[in-house]
């Protein structure tokens, strides 16, 4: 029963619309600006770097908190992986927004850092490298999503964690399908200041 409650908590925390809450604090509805997405890149577009930083931090904590709580309560790798997946699913398909949410990148980063800190931090650093080099946050997200399962596998992480990166990564890639098409067409927004893009 505790395991089920932990997974549900992961989903509920993942569903908290950080971007919308931060946007409101800055006097803007991020759903009506840019791509309309509630994630970090579009919050930057709508309200600037400070709001974007708060959104990224909040979205990452949505992934970190339930995993660390589950671990503190003695949950094993399978439950921890399920909690992590629930948080990402909650962010992508939140109950509070009629299942129309973000793309799971920051929340996924938070869960990865909580599950395996060295690997998760490495993937977070890779995201920044690709994002800054290309100016495409969506490309960075997709690169990290593809690389993560191999990083978790080769670093000897438990099988449930590896499977989580595959299934959770599939959700993130699905949420980025329009970005992938835009990249191929050469119409994807670049990020930077209030005119940036990627999600």
From Swiss-Prot:
Keywords: Cell membrane, Lipid biosynthesis, Lipid metabolism, Membrane, Phospholipid biosynthesis, Phospholipid metabolism, Transferase, Transmembrane, Transmembrane helix
One cellular component term from this protein's GO annotations in UniProt: plasma membrane
Membrane topology: Multi-pass membrane protein
Keyword Transmembrane helix annotated: yes
Compartment(s): Cell membrane
Pathway linked to the protein: Lipid metabolism; phospholipid metabolism
Catalytic activity: an acyl phosphate + sn-glycerol 3-phosphate = a 1-acyl-sn-glycero-3-phosphate + phosphate
Molecular function GO labels: acyl-phosphate glycerol-3-phosphate acyltransferase activity
GO biological process, one term: phospholipid biosynthetic process
Bilayer-crossing regions: 2-22, 77-97, 113-133, 139-159
EC nos: 2.3.1.275
PANTHER family: GLYCEROL-3-PHOSPHATE ACYLTRANSFERASE-RELATED (PTHR30309:SF0), INNER MEMBRANE PROTEIN YGIH (PTHR30309)
Function text: Catalyzes the transfer of an acyl group from acyl-phosphate (acyl-PO(4)) to glycerol-3-phosphate (G3P) to form lysophosphatidic acid (LPA). This enzyme utilizes acyl-phosphate as fatty acyl donor, but not acyl-CoA or acyl-ACP.
Description of how the protein assembles with itself and partners: Probably interacts with PlsX.
Family: Belongs to the PlsY family.
Descriptive protein name: Glycerol-3-phosphate acyltransferase
Provenance organism: Rubrobacter xylanophilus (strain DSM 9941 / JCM 11954 / NBRC 16129 / PRD-1)
Lineage: Bacteria, Bacillati, Actinomycetota, Rubrobacteria, Rubrobacterales
Gene that this polypeptide is encoded by: plsY
